[in-house]
Amino acid sequence: GTFDHFEKDAVVMTGGERVTADMAILAIGWELGIPFLPDSYQKKLVDPDGQYRLYRLIANPDLPDMGFVGFNSSFCTVLNAEMAANWLARYADGQLARQPSTEDMRRNIEMMLHWRRNERPAAGVYGGLCVAPFHFKHFDELLDDMGAKVRRRGALTEKFTPPDADAFARYLASVPDYRVQ
């Protein structure tokens, strides 16, 4: 069968087969959606207008055991996913240099939803998950949260040039060392 739903330690297929798993990776391509999640999760994650309730476009404080890497639209998808994966590993283990409280996350989500709906409604096509053309701001927030010591220089120049993956590798390397336990 195909994927039907999650259980505590397994993925259950449509034919009833249980596949034991420590992790499940969703690779949806370009069609946005998470139809396999229970309605109770959907209601916490997606507003009626299709906007996703995600802090840093990665995590929802009301679904603490779930996070999304590469779920948001970007012109530099691989770099975006790499930054998000590093952020999510630290967030999930409570190891961000600036670990947000649940209330801080909710306030930020509300502020960003208001901004997207009122200032950038065109991004609604992407569930509000498009960081283009705001890559640098998004990456700066993730790096700040992780405690990066090396930061961008010449931000004005960078705004008019493509993202430099090598530079972001240096910024990420300046984050306090952390290995998932």
Name each region found by the language model.
Residues G1-S101, R120-Q181:
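Flavin (primarily FAD) cofactor-binding/catalytic cores of flavoenzymes
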Residues P100-N108:
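Short catalytic/ligand-gating loop segments at beta-alpha or beta-beta junctions
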Residues W115-R117:
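Activation targets extended, charge/polar-rich intrinsically disordered C-terminal tails
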Residues M111-M112:
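Extended repeat-based interaction scaffolds and adjacent low-complexity, acidic/S/T/P-biased segments
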